[in-house]
């Protein structure tokens, strides 16, 4: 006679994430928001392109705001209360994305600018002649 097989519940429950790290990567062409837990594992991400903005509209501050709201919305459902923010890049959406995160109700423990600054490294691209 065959033994009855115990069913194992493979579905994970909702992860509770009280603290997290929000990375804002603002380039001249797009803004990417990635939210990780304190160990560095990605919990949620969004970008202006993933929100439906195409071409030059991806580089607007409004697109960055929409991307930040989409990335944070998932985390509020998972119980995030406190976050650290790391901003990288010179793009136009960096301040607007930070403002959207502040308005979401998550308490920010600190905001750090981690933009890499060259000490006379690579030669910059040539100036545009339009």
Swiss-Prot record:
GO annotations of cellular component type: chloroplast; ribonucleoprotein complex; ribosome
One Gene Ontology term from the biological process aspect of the record: translation
Pfam families from the UniProt entry: Ribosomal_S11 (PF00411)
Matches recorded under SUPFAM superfamilies: Translational machinery components
Superkingdom of origin organism: Eukaryota
Keyword line: Chloroplast, Plastid, Ribonucleoprotein, Ribosomal protein, RNA-binding, rRNA-binding
Molecular function GO terms recorded: rRNA binding; structural constituent of ribosome
Cellular compartment(s): Plastid, Chloroplast
Predominant place of localization: plastid
Subunit field text: Part of the 30S ribosomal subunit.
Family indicated by similarity: Belongs to the universal ribosomal protein uS11 family.
Protein name as it appears in the record: Small ribosomal subunit protein uS11c
Source organism per UniProt: Anthoceros angustus (Hornwort)
Protein's gene: rps11
């Amino acid at each position: 006679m065959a033994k009855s097989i115990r069913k194992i519940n493979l579905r994970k429950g909702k992860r509770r994430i009280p603290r997290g790290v929000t990375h804002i990567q603002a380039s001249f062409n797009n803004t990417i928001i990635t939210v990780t837990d304190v160990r560095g594992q990605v919990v949620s991400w969004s970008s202006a392109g993933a929100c439906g903005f195409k071409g030059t509209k991806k580089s607007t501050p409004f697109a960055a705001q929409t991307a930040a709201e989409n990335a944070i919305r998932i985390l509020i459902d998972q119980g995030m209360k406190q976050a650290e923010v790391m901003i990288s890049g010179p793009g136009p959406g960096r301040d607007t994305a930070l403002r959207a995160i502040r308005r979401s109700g998550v308490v920010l423990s600190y905001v750090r600018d981690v933009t890499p600054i060259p000490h006379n490294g690579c030669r910059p691209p040539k100036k545009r002649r339009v």
